[in-house]
UniProtKB/Swiss-Prot annotation:
Substrate binds at T200, S215, C216, G246, N415, L416, C417, A418, E419, P606, T607, A608, G609, T610. This is Ribonucleoside-diphosphate reductase large subunit. It catalyses: a 2'-deoxyribonucleoside 5'-diphosphate + [thioredoxin]-disulfide + H2O = a ribonucleoside 5'-diphosphate + [thioredoxin]-dithiol. It comes from Human herpesvirus 8 type P (isolate GK18). It is an enzyme of class 1 (oxidoreductase). Disulfide bonds join C216-C431. Belongs to the ribonucleoside diphosphate reductase large chain family. Gene3D superfamilies: 3.20.70.20. It holds the Pfam family Ribonuc_red_lgC.
Length: 792
């Protein structure tokens, strides 16, 4: 029996009025059992069958919507105690109009697209994002109701803050006034179509009473003594983890008789505690500078052979350019390690000032120990190979490109995913995130305007990108102004109003346009996308002050903006030519005169969570795999690259399955036909770093840049060393996020093939070389690699 026939026979008779009946029934219906059986039948096919994947997702949505309130009246009755007062009152006041909006959405293409995103998308939405009641038979918020809740929250903030109301009115293009429902409908259109994708905290908590909407926090406490250390871990960090967010923690100042490993175990234990029976995982990343006397103990904390290793902790190191310069000159020379109690200025300084202080301390004999530079480098690389981390930051790049002078209070750490660059000081830095789904910006050339050979040819629409960025600025600022603050330090840090707007689906855009990831056309489009995004975000933020009468962010008077300078102008030789120079000049002059609402704008974060929901490639990365598997809270699910399989010709499917979707191993003519679907492991990582450098001037925070390496490349430490040195020479802020290694294993050899006629996976080429199967990003990366739902 075909999938279509199965659905018609077993599901066709389910009446529409059954929707919502399970809210009170509390038992599995015949429809649910039938649908679940079909899902189980489809799940073995979803890795390569786009229709099976879409059908499994639609069925899961149907099962779960039977557990959702059927009307907004029911919704308020169930979730009234959870919603904030303003949001609840707004829904009650506009209940009919909102109901009409939701009904229209369920008839729209946007809703169809959401249903067709596949099984993993449907599972992720209900497992992670929507509200639910407690108990053994929970009632769930529907996906449409979730988007409505967030949109209503944004509208409430617009009504409360004049500058946001002005921006909403400007976006809707109403010169005089705009109704509150018009704001909801406008924002809802972008969120529900997943053109603008909000970070997990926003989707889960916007509109909820006391909702904490920031994604990550950064702490830079003094840990010079035991009371200071305990205060940092329990007074500062614990409330942040309790708020279901990620934390970046600088431990470079750790200096007393205890070992850093004991301190890290305390952090690890807290993360483990807060993740116990927690729907949304939290995480913490500890950062240390490379000159610290306990750096080797720090790097050993996650090694698999360490019986006391910190399973739940992530790590990062901040390296001064001095280390790389000395290594390039003579790797056999000594690298000196210091106790921060005797070398406190090394934490505060960067650049020439750091170099001078380091040399002074060496001459004065203030060091604790020393080791050859090559030994320090090997220790770092050994840890990377075994654990996939620590993240690697370049201290000078973090500070030289910051929006204000940081000499004397240098930045030396980041957030949980190493894409946020802020100066915590005595406050707590805050990450407020969203991302633009770039494939939603693709448009088709109208056949009436061009010849038939160009009909249906896609192009990237920068106007659509600009509109989405403006909506993201509105949504994030609504969350900044309307979110709760777990600690006083967060409230102070939020005054900088730092945003992090990222992207997802860049690889899908290139593939749809027929570009290989490293083609010249891709490189140009990549850079232009980020220049356009940065300009639009800065201009919109400025207009919140200029036209909306908003107050500039705290500290703008001493920022580069007050001098009319932009982030890209701190990069030597950079010319922003996609946006005409006279527009940059006029904008800079106006900002210097009137101010700007936000301090930071773009960040390239890993979009693991929201990319699973949309089905597009994560962040700016090339495709991980064309067939992969994903472990959810309950099961392991095959995940297809939908963009790839939509392009696969029916006659080629047998070959695709035989080679596990690995284009690099296809026969020559198939390899050429599908060359734009090579994976990240097939591209030169040095060239991927070059691409990161090309977009870096327009990413004023940083980029979570991972290395994607085949296993044979990490057998020699020199390859990783050369990658780190290349990133240093390029001047990147984040040299490495994770080191993902493609191991020599095959998913195809293990998977159960639904079609008995499908060819078995041979596992080996004729010449005896290993034949890769479909790649599982979770298995390819180290065990430390998280599915970072904390940020996205």
């Amino acid at each position: 029996m075909s999938v279509r026939t199965f659905c018609q026979v077993h599901l066709g008779a389910v009446p529409p009025e059954r929707r919502g009946s399970q809210v009170s029934a509390g038992q599995l219906s015949d429809f649910d059992m039938c649908a679940q059986s079909l899902i189980d039948f489809l799940k073995v096919r979803v890795g390569w069958d786009v229709r099976a994947n879409a059908m499994a997702g639609r069925l899961w949505h149907q099962i779960m919507e039977a557990r959702c309130p059927a009307t907004l009246k029911q919704y308020l009755g169930i979730f009234r105690g959870v919603l904030g007062h303003r949001v609840e009152s707004f829904i009650q006041k506009n209940i009919d109009a909102l109901e009409d909006m939701l009904c229209a959405y369920r008839r729209s293409k946007a809703y169809e697209d959401t249903l067709n995103c596949g099984y993993l998308s449907a599972v992720r939405l209900y497992d992670t994002y929507v509200l639910r009641t407690m108990g053994t038979e929970p009632v769930y918020e529907s996906v449409a109701q979730m988007f409505m809740r967030v949109s209503v929250f944004v509208a409430c903030q617009c009504l409360e803050h004049e500058c946001l109301y002005w921006l909403a009115r400007d976006l809707i293009e109403d010169a005089k006034s705009v109704s509150e429902m018009a704001i909801v409908e406008y924002v809802f259109g972008y969120l529900a179509a997943q053109h603008v994708c909000c970070a997990t905290p926003i989707l889960r908590s916007a509109g909820v009473e006391g909702g904490q909407l920031a994604s990550c926090f950064i702490l830079q406490p003094s840990m010079m003594n035991e009371p200071g250390t305990l205060d940092a871990l329990y007074h500062d960090m614990s409330p942040l983890l309790a708020s279901k967010s990620g934390v970046g923690l600088d431990v470079t100042s750790f200096s007393h008789q205890k070992n850093i490993a004991s301190c890290l175990k305390l952090v690890d234990a807290q993360v483990h505690y807060f993740n116990d029976n927690n729907i949304r995982p939290v995480g913490a990343s500890a950062y240390m500078e490379l000159w610290h006397s306990q750096i080797c103990d720090f790097l050993n904390a996650k090694l698999p052979e360490n019986p006391d290793r910190c399973h739940s902790l992530f790590q990062g190191v901040c390296i001064p350019t001095l280390f790389f310069r000395m290594y390039e000159k003579d790797p056999s020379k000594l690298w000196y390690l210091f106790d921060p109690a005797t070398a406190p200025n090394l934490i505060k300084l960067y650049g020439a000032a750091f170099d001078n202080e380091y040399e002074r301390l060496v001459r004065a004999g203030k060091y604790v120990s020393c080791m050859p530079l090559k030994s320090m480098m090997f220790t770092l690389i050994h840890t990377i190979i075994k654990t996939g981390s620590p993240y690697v930051l370049l201290k000078e790049a973090l500070n030289e490109h910051h929006w204000t002078d940081t000499q004397g209070m240098a930045i030396n750490c980041s957030n949980l995913c190493a894409e946020i660059v802020q100066l915590p000081g005595r406050n707590t830095s805050v990450c407020n995130l969203a991302n633009i789904c770039l494939p939603k910006c693709l448009r088709t050339v109208e056949s009436a305007r061009v010849g038939t050979t160009d009909a249906n040819r896609p192009f990237f629409c920068f106007e659509a990108l600009g509109d989405a960025v403006r909506v993201a600025v509105l949504v994030i600022n609504a969350c900044i102004l309307g979110g709760s603050h777990p600690t006083p330090g967060v409230e102070r840090g939020q005054k900088e109003r730092s945003m992090g707007i990222g992207v997802q689906g860049l690889a899908d855009v290139f593939a749809e346009l027929g570009y290989g990831y490293l083609d010249a056309e891709s490189a140009e489009l990549d850079k232009n996308i980020f220049q356009s995004m940065y300009y639009t975000a800065v201009e919109t933020s400025h207009n919140l002050v200029l036209e909306g009468q908003g107050v500039p962010f705290h500290g703008w008077e001493v920022s580069n903006f007050a001098k009319g300078r932009f982030h890209w102008q701190t990069w030597e030789g950079e010319d922003a030519s996609f946006v005409p120079r006279h527009r940059w000049d006029a904008l800079g002059k106006s900002i210097a005169e009137h101010g700007i609402f936000n301090s930071q704008f773009l960040a390239v974060m890993p979009t693991a969570g929201t990319s699973q929901v949309t089905g597009y490639a994560e962040s700016v990365y090339p495709f991980f795999a064309n067939i992969s598997s994903k472990v959810t809270n309950k099961e392991e699910v095959l995940r297809p690259n939908v963009t790839f399989f939509k392009k696969v010709l029916p006659d080629d499917l047998r070959v695709v399955r035989q080679y596990g979707g690995d284009v690099s191993t296809f026969p020559k003519h198939h390899r050429e036909r599908y060359r734009v679907f090579l994976t990240a492991f097939d591209y030169c990582p040095f060239k991927l770093l070059d691409r990161a450098r090309a977009r870096a001037p327009f990413v004023d925070q940083s980029q979570s840049m991972s290395f994607f390496l085949k296993e044979d490349r990490v057998r020699n430490a020199s390859y990783l060393r050369d990658l780190l040195l290349h990133g240093y020479r390029l001047g990147l802020k984040t040299l490495m996020y994770y080191c993902r290694v493609q191991k020599q294993s095959s998913l195809t050899a293990l998977q159960c093939l639904a079609d008995p006629g499908s060819p078995p996976h041979s596992g080996m080429k004729q010449d005896g070389a290993w034949l890769p199967g479909p790649k599982n990003p979770e298995e390819e990366s180290c065990a430390a690699d998280p599915e970072c739902l904390v940020c996205q």
